[in-house]
Amino acid sequence: MRFARAAPAHKRPTLSVHLAELHGAIAATYASSKALIAAVTVEGLVTDFIKAKSEYSAGEISDFKKLIKELEAPKRVVSHLCQQVANLGTVNTSRRLKALVDSGIVDEGEVKIWNEGRHKLAHGKKSAGHEDVDRYLAAVTLVHAIVLSLLAYDGPYQSRSRQGIRQRRSVPLPKELLVN
């Protein structure tokens, strides 16, 4: 970056250019921070209150590991593959959100925006400001839908996005999805 003093007088950027850059950086950081906080809130809610079934049983995972151990591959590769297969039995946030989608509590499109945004925001990937606004609104809508279902609210509510306000219907959380 070139400093204003190093540029000839007739080519120096104006003070307003620098202030505009600063304002843009602050606004982008603000939107990113809000989106990340909302995304983490979704993760906390589903981790603490929602349960889902593992994709594979312990027996299936054990069988997969046995097959992997029979491979003629370096020990490091076999170990890595066994760890990846073990993770198939883990019930993570995405699996819990999928259970909520399947129950009609949350919208699959918002979960997709949340998932993409959460990874980008948590790992410091740059994005356009409007993407962070979309991520924030999707995460807030997920929070509202999850909280309303946890409260066993059965009725209308409004979700907001950059496209506008949408009428939606909340349904109570099925008992089999509620952590005891």
Give short role names for the model-derived ranges.
Residues 1-180:
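Amphipathic, oligomerization/interface secondary-structure segments
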